Amino acid sequence: MRAVIQRVKKSWVEVDGKVVGSINEGLNVFLGVRKGDTEEDIEKLVNKILNLRIFEDERGKFQYSVLDIKGEILVVSQFTLYANVKKGRRPSFEEAEEPKRAKELYEKFVDKIKESGLKVETGIFGAMMDVFIENWGPVTIIIDSREI
């Protein structure tokens, strides 16, 4: 499971011109599910995201997590995080999980992160989405569950 995490001042996602998820200060999380991912990957990734100290204290040091600041989280599915561009010019997505299983794990990820008590919003799995992000920093971090 792979997540691209961006610290944001605000972020929202639209489908067919309608806002389906919107947050203020917190994290935008693009989530990709890889073949072979399990609930253990969800546990590790959620724990890392919730406790990652990427919010600054008064001295400008990364001291606080999204939990500490009681921030908000927008989770958007993105299978293209598993693009392979080694051959040719068209990316291959062979490493990405099949849609049915990917949706199941994505929903479990969202449920797990909601257990934090923070406001959590989402896009719509499998939909063509327009994502609007006001980066804060910018701070962008890529985390792969198999590397933590």
Swiss-Prot record:
The keyword Cytoplasm applies. Pfam families: Tyr_Deacylase (PF02580). The keyword Lyase does not apply. GO terms for molecular function: D-tyrosyl-tRNA(Tyr) deacylase activity; Gly-tRNA(Ala) deacylase activity; Ser(Gly)-tRNA(Ala) hydrolase activity; tRNA binding. Its EC number is 3.1.1.96. Keywords: Cytoplasm, Hydrolase, RNA-binding, tRNA-binding. InterPro entries: Daa-tRNA_deacyls_DTD (IPR003732), DTD-like_sf (IPR023509). GO terms for cellular component: cytoplasm. It is found in: Cytoplasm. SUPFAM superfamilies: DTD-like (SSF69500). A Gly-cisPro motif from one monomer fits into the active site of the other monomer to allow specific chiral rejection of L-amino acids. An aminoacyl-tRNA editing enzyme that deacylates mischarged D-aminoacyl-tRNAs. Also deacylates mischarged glycyl-tRNA(Ala), protecting cells against glycine mischarging by AlaRS. Acts via tRNA-based rather than protein-based catalysis; rejects L-amino acids rather than detecting D-amino acids in the active site. By recycling D-aminoacyl-tRNA to D-amino acids and free tRNA molecules, this enzyme counteracts the toxicity associated with the formation of D-aminoacyl-tRNA entities in vivo and helps enforce protein L-homochirality. This is D-aminoacyl-tRNA deacylase. It comes from Aquifex aeolicus (strain VF5). The gene is dtd.
